[in-house]
Amino acid sequence: MKVFSFTIGLVVIISLFAFALAYDEETDLMKKLVEMERAIEQRIICAPEGGPCVVGIGCCKGYSCAPGLLGLVGHCQ
């Protein structure tokens, strides 16, 4: 009975440790994504003539986005 209790306790401790590590990695990933998003927002992004245009990246002044295949990615003209 003591071996069973010890085994269950060990499994619980290892599981908690694994969840803690996974949470830390997820938190770090979210921080990196937020930093990347801020960097993109700070830059002025526009696509030149013939360049791809998608949601969030529009065409430079004087060009408009022509819809592409299935309306996913267009091109500036």
Curated annotation (Swiss-Prot):
The keyword 4Fe-4S does not apply. The keyword Disulfide bond applies. It is found in: Secreted. Residues 23-43 form a propeptide. Expressed by the venom gland. One of its GO terms (cellular component) is extracellular region. GO terms for molecular function: toxin activity. Disulfide bonds join 46-60, 53-65, 59-76. Intrathorax injection into crickets causes paralysis prolonged for more than 60 minutes, followed by recovery. The presence of a 'disulfide through disulfide knot' structurally defines this protein as a knottin. Belongs to the neurotoxin 14 (magi-1) family. 05 (ICK-7) subfamily. This is U8-hexatoxin-Mg1a. It comes from Macrothele gigas.
